[in-house]
């Protein structure tokens, strides 16, 4: 089966919720890792630092700063060896965190429903898997860029974006030159 972004999007939008509800485990595990980092001293402590009073004056107290805090916090905890599980994507814990927490934080802070969260997380994670399989074994494209692309798709959809806007999010996040078409000039077909 040739996987396309359209197939990923359609799957995330139309699959019965009970069949994909398991994706909430990624949110629970990765958020718990972030929260653990806020309580301890892990790695560079960036997630914890971004929550401080001084940093709020620099970064602000916004959805964006919260996304940065949770995502970097969970990565700090993971990389510093905290005894806490995280959910990976394509074999990488940091990619799993980066495909999950931006979408989760955005959904929570904007009052999105559980169904919307499930579908956005599924879109994010499957987009990462789709892009990774399109890139092949070796790529000059960093895995965290790929994970951020997945998150951008999930957040775009949560903002009311259509399939076309989700596809534009991919193109804006990943240079078009990194992915090649199977039979057309666009990998998004």
Q: What positions do the PLM features span?
A:
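Signature of multi-pass transmembrane helix bundles
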Residues: 1-81
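Alpha-helical support elements that line or immediately flank enzyme active sites
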Residues: 96-112, 152-160
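Flexible glycine/proline-rich, aromatic-decorated loop/lid segments
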Residues: 166-176
């Amino acid at each position: 089966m040739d996987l396309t972004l359209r197939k990923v999007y359609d799957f995330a939008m139309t699959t019965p919720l009970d069949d994909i509800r398991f994706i909430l485990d990624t949110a629970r595990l990765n958020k718990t890792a972030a929260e653990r980092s806020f309580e301890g001293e892990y790695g560079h402590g960036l997630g914890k630092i971004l929550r401080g009073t001084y940093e709020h004056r620099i970064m602000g107290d916004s959805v964006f700063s919260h996304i940065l805090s949770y995502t970097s916090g969970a990565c700090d905890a993971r990389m510093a060896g905290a005894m806490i599980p995280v959910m990976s994507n394509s074999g990488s814990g940091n990619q799993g965190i980066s495909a999950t927490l931006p979408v989760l934080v955005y959904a929570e802070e904007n009052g999105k429903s559980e169904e919307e969260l499930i579908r956005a997380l599924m879109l994010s994670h499957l987009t990462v898997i789709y892009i990774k399989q399109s890139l092949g074994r070796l790529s000059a494209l960093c895995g965290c860029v790929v994970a951020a692309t997945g998150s951008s798709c999930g957040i775009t959809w949560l903002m009311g974006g259509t399939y076309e806007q989700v596809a534009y999010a991919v193109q804006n996040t990943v240079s078009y030159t990194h992915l090649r078409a199977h039979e057309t000039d666009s990998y998004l077909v």
